[in-house]
Amino acid sequence: MPHLRYNNSMPLSGLLWREKAAGIKAERAIGMDFLLILLMLFLGITGGYLFLIAPSIRRKKKSIPPDFFRPYAHRGLHDEKCGVMENSLPAFRRAAEKGYGIELDVHLTMDGHLIVHHDHSLLRLCGRDRQISRMTLAQIQSYRLGNTDEKIPTLDEVLSLVDGRVPLILELKSTRFGDTALAETTFRRMQAYRGQWCVESFDPVLVRWYKRHAPGIIRGQLAYDPGKLKDERKKKSLIHFLSAHLLCNFLSRPDFVAYGHETDKNLSFRVMRSLFRPCLAAWTVRSLEDFKILQSQYDWQIFEAFEP
């Protein structure tokens, strides 16, 4: 019996084989296209992620003055049991005399003065539940720190006392996210200071202000991962998530990252540290044992409750 033919030229079995082969090739092509799309998506997402968490690439660690690489007394070398309160002139004097760098907190008062205090309220240290941003300098300095005769110092008073002896880390404590008035006012005041200083903040917009308007000033991004804390300090919000995972670094492009060392198992922090190798500061280190362990992992350590 003769073979059935298609168009009087090809056996039907041959046609079916060719159609099957063409189908296989088409499926392979579709599969390759799909894999290529997946690869492009992966590379795009990875590239975007790295773009977000990358620190500054213009100022490498080696270009930061060597004088900055030392331990920093957190809010000065304070000891409340000895009557030396945090962020007080005696605490700053003790730190400077011993050669420690100083980390301190800067607020803007209602009448435009710069004071040195950590909390937004006076409640913890002065026993009055009043907001610094809603008080004048005269009102703030009418109170005393704890049971001492010390008042909350102005930034001018601290600068006069330290007088360039040790480097300073100024943490900018903004009341409202993105309010750059504090960054600008601090910069104007610090232009006349002859000592070494740098700034840091949890607010990436304030750090970005220095990137855009004062790129010569060393700037740092403060962060920690509240999700890795086991106590009431946990915070859950979009801004805390972005901050914890360093996803705002694209705004600030920090010269150094100051990260809460208790939470530094965070994936973004570890990726950033491994790939970009930026200058790193650990906060807050509270024991000599931790200090020794962290020496090989961080460039600067901000410490309290002991002396390294």
Regions found by a protein language model. Give the residues of each.
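Intrinsically disordered, low-complexity regions enriched in Ser/Pro/Gly/Gln/His and often acidic
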Residues: 10-11, 190
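Phosphate-group recognition and catalysis centered on beta-loop-alpha active-site segments
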Residues: 27-308
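Short linear sequence elements within intrinsically disordered, low-complexity coil regions
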Residues: 11-14, 97
